[in-house]
Amino acid sequence: MKWLQIHITVDQEQVEFTETLLMSLGAVSVTLDDAEDQALLEPLPGETPLWNKVIVTGIYQQDEQDPIDVDTLEAFLKAQLPDVPMRHEELEDQVWERAWMDYYEPIQIGEKFWIVPEWLEPPEADATNIKLDPGLAFGTGNHASTFLCLQWLGKTDVKNKIVIDYGCGSGILGVAALLLGAKKVYATDIDPQAVLATKQNAELNGVLDRLYVGLPEEFDQEFKPQQADVLVANILAGPLMALAPEFAKLLKSDGDFALAGVIEEQVVDVSGVYSEFFDILDVEKREENWCRISGKRKTTN
């Protein structure tokens, strides 16, 4: 079977209409991608986070007995969406199945880590190689905030320590900590798919026996009343600020922490909230204004 992809570049205001239009014409799926390499920032309450320019891609099955007339389909779409860039391509089944896999290559992060898609061989066998299924959930090492957290973990002493990975996504940070010798990682995420992905990626790396992962309410029951030696949270500024008092309870006095998912303009606000409970020792910035805030839990009496 062949597949037909229609790519349409529209303004943010046209996205919903374009999605609905493609689905009404029989698309088996519709995906959204950034058309201008922009950072997707945290939305205000009630807003949908989208880029200014969006590539909307509809995917159609091409039945050999009754194929889609591409010219007719594009003519109809152009009548509904005049003056917008549009292109199409046809993919064979085997190309379609592997297209997303071909996008990924091993990524080196700092001096310690290689992030290696599970179907590829590590470039350096003696490095700390994190095997990953990039299709499972957010967090592959490509995003600046994930990179910053991994870089920090590589410089932080986690050996034989209890580590919390809050907002675990793919589980990449928790797996990294375990490969560096952490005694136990407690991971949590609000997304059930992330919980599953974290388990699967931990199993890929042979560290599942030292990992606990669950939804926040399950995590609360499992972890309390313990305290961790290290806490890393790669989420967004709003949730991070709301969670500051909770993180203060979860982390031991003088424990290490790192926060990411924060842009430069939000650093002052986030640091201000955390300064009540934590000593801010470092702010590291990477491309697209993404920052990492790190430091230590203040000593409590």
Swiss-Prot record:
Function as written in the Swiss-Prot or TrEMBL entry: Methylates ribosomal protein L11.
Domain of life according to the entry: Bacteria
Binding site for S-adenosyl-L-methionine: 146, 167, 189, 234
Class of this enzyme: transferase
Keyword tags: Cytoplasm, Methyltransferase, S-adenosyl-L-methionine, Transferase
Lineage: Bacteria, Pseudomonadati, Pseudomonadota, Gammaproteobacteria, Moraxellales
Protein name: Ribosomal protein L11 methyltransferase
Cytoplasm found in the keyword field: yes
Listed GO biological process terms: methylation
One CC-aspect GO term: cytosol
Catalytic activity: L-lysyl-[protein] + 3 S-adenosyl-L-methionine = N(6),N(6),N(6)-trimethyl-L-lysyl-[protein] + 3 S-adenosyl-L-homocysteine + 3 H(+)
Enzyme Commission no: 2.1.1.-
Cellular compartment(s): Cytoplasm
InterPro entries: Ribosomal_L11_MeTrfase_PrmA (IPR050078), Ribosomal_PrmA_MeTrfase (IPR004498), SAM-dependent_MTases_sf (IPR029063)
Family: Belongs to the methyltransferase superfamily. PrmA family.
The UniProt record lists the keyword Transferase: yes
